[in-house]
Amino acid sequence: ASLVGYNYLKSSQNDSAFADAVGAGDGTKASGSIDIYNMSFGITYPTAFSGLPITKYNALDNGVKTLRSGKGAIYVKSAGNYFDWNSSPRYCGPNGAISDYMSCADAGNGRLASTPYVIVVGALNASGTKTSYSSPGSSLWVSGFGGEYGTTNPAIMTTDQSSCSQGYVRSGLASSNLFNNQGNHSENSSCNYDSKFNGTSSAAPTVSGVIALMLEANSSLTWRDVKHILATTSVQVDASRTKTLSGVLQYAWVTNAASHKFHNWYGFGKVNAAAAVDAAKSYTANSLGTW
């Protein structure tokens, strides 16, 4: 497998740049041969809900219809990190308290999440339940590990820019996380690793990695097959999680018309890599019919 980087946020972020980023442009900046597009970026809240502009929708529509020889590109999107604010009041429920368990934003406010072409990913902590920040909503498909902030609770370990002269872990940048502190830790003396990677931007690529394993096991899978396998093999977590506010049931696991369990915090649940790959091996590709 190969990795290709495209810094959409560094671009003009116009429709043409987006089309290039998702493989539906002229191919000069993002090759149409890419299988999985991980989109770890989001919008700034607060914001009103609005639909995806038609030009961006068409770019995704083209991607799922023509890329991967017609099997469709796989688009994976981070849900967002706005369950609470980094300001006062921090929490957005009627009592302004964490015990309200009411998010300050909905993942569906991110316009890309409003399309069926995108796999929206929420973030789990090291205990396998929702992180403190992960944005919920009916647009979530599955959840992957994103970690907390790497100080009192674990985050995700990842590579950093090499050497102590650049990157998140570098000389002159003190950190309360000893592993990340300027190369002073014996196991990170060259500052090549960062143990504070987090956010749904961290969770999304863990799911992209699972999808890569699925396509390695069965390269004939369509984009819809991938979504179906993830939905049917993911694991229910935090099973008793429920909350009623002002007489309205806000959060609980429900069983949909297809007999799949779903929760606005978790989507269809925690991705199970082994089960997803096993299912992919024997899956009859393109067997879901038209839609």
What are the residue ranges of the model-derived segments?
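Proline-centered loop/turn at the N-terminus of a beta-strand
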Residues: S2, D35, G72-Y75, I119, ...
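A structural signal for well-ordered alpha-helical segments within the folded catalytic domains
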Residues: I54, N58, L140, A204-A212, ...
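Outer-envelope exported proteins of Gram-negative bacteria
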Residues: I74-S78, S143, K227-A231
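C-terminal subdomain of the subtilisin-like protease fold in secreted/lumenal serine endopeptidases
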Residues: K29-S40, Y117-V118, N184-F197, E216-W291
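Substrate-binding/access-modulating region of protease and related hydrolase catalytic domains
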Residues: G5-T115, S127-T129, E187-T206, A217-S220, ...
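Short aromatic-enriched loop/helix-cap "lid" or pocket-rim segments at secondary-structure transitions
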Residues: S87-Y91, Y133-S134, R241-T244
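Extracellular S/T/G-rich loop segment that most often corresponds to the catalytic His/Ser-adjacent loop
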Residues: Y101-A212, E216
